[in-house]
Amino acid sequence: MALVTKLLVASRNRKKLAELRRVLDGAGLSGLTLLSLGDVSPLPETPETGVTFEDNALAKARDAFSATGLASVADDSGLEVAALGGMPGVLSARWSGRYGDDAANTALLLAQLCDVPDERRGAAFVSACALVSGSGEVVVRGEWPGTIAREPRGDGGFGYDPVFVPYGDDRTAAQLSPAEKDAVSHRGRALALLLPALRSLATG
């Protein structure tokens, strides 16, 4: 009987977890069983005190691995807007001062960009994914370039998706199907870079 390796996805964000599951499942990684934080004993929240996405992703994966002994993957992601000097960056989820309030965060972002012309509204979604296991640590980064729309459009996705228009498209990320988003998104790109390490884990 083939051994099954348990992989802990260290996130409490259900929408992010679903996206991670879709991408990993779509890669056809046999031999891996995905677990969420809800499947293990309660873990303390890892504070996002890093100055980079990589710092935060690695801290979350390290904490999960240390607490459970399970190979753990974690993501930290956000939006970098050129006209705002790369902000909100690692502060994306709490840009308005209220953690996880997507509507408030988006409203503040649009207000800050209200006088910025279209040609200067460039931005990129960034995702850093970290894998920590008994074999070591791997950290990768994916970016999804685009621009910021002037008003929200679409009901899909989460976070800043309704105002992010990927280069080469006229729809926002919130107007893409899950499959379309997974194929091109920052998280999808980061996970694609992580797949060799995950395959080694599954066959190890």
From Swiss-Prot:
InterPro entries named among the record's database cross-references: dITP/XTP_pyrophosphatase (IPR020922), ITPase-like_fam (IPR029001), RdgB/HAM1 (IPR002637)
Binding site residues for Mg(2+): 76
NCBIfam families (alphabetical): RdgB/HAM1 family non-canonical purine NTP pyrophosphatase
Enzyme Commission identifier(s): 3.6.1.66
Superkingdom of origin: Bacteria
Pfam family for this entry, one: Ham1p_like
Active site: 76 (proton acceptor)
Entry-linked PANTHER family: INOSINE TRIPHOSPHATE PYROPHOSPHATASE, INOSINE TRIPHOSPHATE PYROPHOSPHATASE/HAM1 PROTEIN
Catalytic function, reaction form: XTP + H2O = XMP + diphosphate + H(+); dITP + H2O = dIMP + diphosphate + H(+); ITP + H2O = IMP + diphosphate + H(+)
Record's keyword annotation contains DNA damage: no
Subunit structure: Homodimer.
Protein's name according to its UniProt entry: dITP/XTP pyrophosphatase
Any one GO biological process: purine nucleoside triphosphate catabolic process
GO molecular function: dITP diphosphatase activity; ITP diphosphatase activity; metal ion binding; nucleoside triphosphate diphosphatase activity; nucleotide binding; ribonucleoside triphosphate phosphatase activity; XTP diphosphatase activity
Annotated cofactor note: Binds 1 Mg(2+) ion per subunit.
Sequence similarity: Belongs to the HAM1 NTPase family.
Keywords: Hydrolase, Magnesium, Metal-binding, Nucleotide metabolism, Nucleotide-binding
Keyword Transmembrane: no
Listed GO CC annotations: cytoplasm; cytosol
Entries under SUPFAM superfamilies matching the protein: ITPase-like
Residues involved in substrate binding: 11-16, 77, 158-161, 181, 186-187
Function, in words: Pyrophosphatase that catalyzes the hydrolysis of nucleoside triphosphates to their monophosphate derivatives, with a high preference for the non-canonical purine nucleotides XTP (xanthosine triphosphate), dITP (deoxyinosine triphosphate) and ITP. Seems to function as a house-cleaning enzyme that removes non-canonical purine nucleotides from the nucleotide pool, thus preventing their incorporation into DNA/RNA and avoiding chromosomal lesions.
Species annotation: Mycobacterium tuberculosis (strain ATCC 25618 / H37Rv)
Enzyme class label: hydrolase
CC cofactor: Mg(2+)
